[in-house]
């Protein structure tokens, strides 16, 4: 397995290293059931509720706040894929049952984290939901986009119903926690249109979040730092706070494995 060391070369816990160097807030990804029919995990850390609770227990020892990131999926949920959890598949065409699933899972999970002493400061309802969530997504084969989900009155109402179900659970279980809605995009027009749909459907949230990968696809111009200020100002104009939900950076430009790097010496 992976081992972590402090700056003195002593093997120790990753969370201790982070805490000792000023990190006071961590984001825990939550998947519903990241296993196949044989019980084998899909990979990616197998971040189900049980795995998240183990992280939360240790984080509590270091007085770290938690951001719980609900994907409402068994694996990665992002702009390309927002697949319904296996256990909810039978309810795909029943909007009311799906809302109940979201509410119940969110509430039950938050309670479990509270029982292990987690300090929940923020809850993210959905992950990178730019194009939709829970299988309400554009038909890319027909050239559809986010406008066919969030810009479609019927779809937007259903999607916002799911968001409100999750948010209701958060408000009931941990009323002091901030509710975050997270898009991958930093496109001003796109973000504004989606926020319009939330507003028109009465979605109650505190923080607008985006991802920020400056060299995504090797192109820094699409994700320049100036864009962050524009999106922050957009959030403020709607009475919301703004936060970067995802980012990363490299520690070396060198090639380590002979496969192409997203960012390399050529950049």
Task: For each feature predicted by the language model, list its residue ranges.
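Glycoside hydrolase catalytic-domain groove-lining segments
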Residues: 12-15, 160-161, 168, 172-182, ...
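Short, charged, low-hydrophobicity "junction" segments
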Residues: 1-6, 38-41, 45-47, 55, ...
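Short, acidic/polar
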Residues: 2-20, 52, 102-112, 188-200
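Short, glycine/charged-enriched secondary-structure capping and boundary segments
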Residues: 6, 41-42, 80-83, 137-140, ...
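Short, low-complexity, polar/charged sequence segments that are solvent-exposed and flexible
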Residues: 7-12, 85-89, 142-144, 198-200, ...
């Amino acid at each position: 397995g992976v081992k972590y060391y402090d700056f003195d070369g002593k093997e120790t816990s990753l969370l201790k290293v982070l805490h000792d160097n000023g990190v006071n807030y961590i984001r825990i990804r939550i998947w519903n059931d990241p296993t196949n029919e044989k019980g084998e995990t899909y990979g990616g850390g197998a971040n189900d509720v049980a795995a998240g609770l183990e992280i939360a227990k240790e984080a509590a020892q270091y007085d770290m706040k938690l951001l719980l990131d609900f994907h409402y999926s068994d694996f990665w949920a992002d702009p390309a894929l927002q697949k319904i959890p296996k256990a909810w598949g039978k309810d795909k065409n029943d909007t009311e049952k799906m809302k109940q699933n979201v509410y119940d899972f969110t509430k039950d999970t938050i309670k479990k984290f509270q029982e292990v002493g987690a300090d929940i400061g923020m809850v993210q309802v959905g992950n990178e939901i730019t194009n939709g969530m829970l299988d309400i997504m554009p038909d890319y084969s027909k050239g559809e986009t986010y406008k066919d989900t969030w810009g479609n009155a019927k779809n937007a109402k259903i999607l916002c119903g799911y968001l409100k179900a999750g948010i209701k659970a958060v408000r009931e279980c941990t009323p002091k926690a901030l509710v975050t809605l997270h898009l991958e995009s930093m496109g001003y027009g796109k973000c504004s249109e989606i926020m319009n749909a939330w507003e028109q459907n009465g979605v109650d949230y505190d923080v607008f979040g985006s991802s920020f990968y400056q060299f995504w696809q090797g192109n820094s111009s699409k994700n320049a730092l100036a864009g962050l200020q524009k999106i922050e100002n957009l959030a403020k104009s709607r009475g919301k706070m703004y936060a970067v939900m995802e980012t990363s950076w490299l520690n070396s430009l060198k090639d380590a494995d002979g496969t192409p790097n997203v960012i390399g010496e050529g950049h």
